[in-house]
Amino acid sequence: MAQQVSGRQPRYKRILLKLSGEALMGSEDFGIDPKVLDRMALEVGQLVGIGVQVGLVIGGGNLFRGAALSAAGMDRVTGDHMGMLATVMNGLAMRDALERSNIPALVMSAISMVGVTDHYDRRKAIRHLNSGDVVIFSAGTGNPFFTTDSAACLRAIEIDADVVLKATKVDGVYTADPFKDPHAEKFDHLTYDEVLDRKLGVMDLTAICLCRDHKMPLRVFNMNKPGALLNIVVGGAEGTLIEEGQA
């Protein structure tokens, strides 16, 4: 059952949470770590418990990397289609974890997969969100050459989410890779144009421009920090906030 969290009022009514496929690997070298799935399902359940509507987009990098095989000679479109299928596999695994916790969930795919997932339908997705179901958007945008980050921003705009929350391995956006540069400094707040001008690599250009053009706030945070997701949703200042206006 969705866990009830008392005494904390959500700042956002509807969010779009973007998880990388790599996040699902946990301590494994490949695939899906069931312990990570269960932990993420618990954190999402906490949000549902306080009345937050949750849309999810999960990458596929834990199962397939189209870009790497494309560099080795595979046709890019074929590689991207295979990557889309990987995101469907991750979506099904996440749905299973949520339902085992008695959290109703629905997987929608941008590629028609009758009998496996529902086909993506914006109006149907919004109806399910309004009913308290977690909606998992898979297969990216359904088109090659678009990343799952772009898909996350697109779906967030389509379902009229209040914010895109991008879960990463670090607690925000830095001036450089903090794993490689010990002097890298973290930003608490950035504008879309600053991200583009500084080439910070938060998301690809298409995703950032989508957010900028539709004034969709984006927050980057560390999913491995316990309670970070809930803290953001109730108004905490985790990670880095990217939005329009002055930094």
From Swiss-Prot:
Signal peptide: none annotated. Its main location: cytoplasm. It catalyses: UMP + ATP = UDP + ADP. Its EC number is 2.7.4.22. ATP binds at K18, L19, S20, G21, G61, R65, T168, Y174, D177. One of its GO terms (cellular component) is cytosol. It comes from the Bacteria. InterPro entries: AceGlu_kinase-like_sf, Asp/Glu/Uridylate_kinase, Uridylate_kinase, Uridylate_kinase_bac. UMP binds at G60, D80, T141, G142, N143, P144, F145, F146, T147, T148. The keyword Mitochondrion does not apply. Belongs to the UMP kinase family. This is Uridylate kinase. It comes from Pseudomonas putida (strain ATCC 47054 / DSM 6125 / CFBP 8728 / NCIMB 11950 / KT2440). The lineage of its organism: Bacteria, Pseudomonadati, Pseudomonadota, Gammaproteobacteria, Pseudomonadales.
